[in-house]
């Protein structure tokens, strides 16, 4: 019952943010960068671009991956990393839009809890501290089996943004 209430809080917050961020999600990207290899190899290729520090090219690669393989088990992870390409460059509106899309489209992905956390953090970075804190504070209730490392990050972010 309590988890359902917390998820309702998150959903209401997301609905209000969704209106503001919707136009950011549909940014057209025309470039294709992924090689014609297996899906797993394409994901690995995109991750290697990310690790190399070419975040603009990684943005294109992860977007292409998600657009092409939206039903694949790695799509949720790719969506998270797509958001990270923006966050690293401090493009917080684009990052928030990507994390929001990841949370909504891939709620059962292994990256879903981190998507929710980073959505909260980016909202707080954008000055929407109250909304961001709702995401951060409710993370454990929304995803009770979250990794300890993500809960630790959540704790840190609660303190950083003075969340109650």
Residue positions per predicted region:
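Acidic, proline-/serine-/threonine-rich low-complexity intrinsically disordered segments
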Residues: 1-45, 49-50
